């Protein structure tokens, strides 16, 4: 059983017109960094006719916070005409919603085999699981290098860059961070898209490390097109294989939407 339980909204942080974070308080079961949950509201929050049976509108969202943090943080993109995301965007401090008691998913460090360099690629809100993992500081000393890469459309969408910089300092040289923007040029970020920046080797040259099957593991999270294209490139160009629970590989993936 995995029942819905109540969550109380402590804060809604609206980063842009389309990006926001919910800070929640809820008595959920312990979860692992990198896992996701489900949030829901009843359809009665919208003006439906009385003859329509009311049900929960639910969506899956990843945690940004470390499991040891008592406040839950969820990073969300507001979808045009999206039923739930627009309702969540308009919540206020003190409002309530539903959250699943138990969390889901295997996008966790326990599923990652030992390696020298762990690459974490994210687009958009896919940065969330990595923030959770890196803030927890567990099962992470076995990696010599951790590379965190966040790709967005515009520079102002790098909403968790201050946290990334704090983590960079706290890891004392183990963690490297890089940002990418695809729809404008900014001297603080690489310009382009992840698959192309791997194909032309610009990204690896900037980092100073090369992805290879002998000492690297790659985590991909976010836009399904990025995940697919990056996976296919690594599979073909670097002879890397998908990581499975029954058979360890070199690439661990999680699609958003």
UniProtKB/Swiss-Prot annotation:
FAD binds at residues 59-62, 75, 83-85, 125, 256-257. It is an enzyme of class 1 (oxidoreductase). PROSITE patterns: FAD_FR. This is Flavodoxin/ferredoxin--NADP reductase. The lineage of its organism: Bacteria, Pseudomonadati, Pseudomonadota, Gammaproteobacteria, Enterobacterales. It comes from the Bacteria. Gene3D superfamilies: Nucleotide-binding domain of ferredoxin-NADP reductase (FNR) module, Translation factors. Residues 2-110 form the FAD-binding FR-type domain. One of its GO terms (cellular component) is cytoplasm. It comes from Buchnera aphidicola subsp. Schizaphis graminum (strain Sg). It is found in: Cytoplasm. SUPFAM superfamilies: Ferredoxin reductase-like, C-terminal NADP-linked domain, Riboflavin synthase domain-like. Transports electrons between flavodoxin or ferredoxin and NADPH. Its EC number is 1.18.1.2, 1.19.1.1.
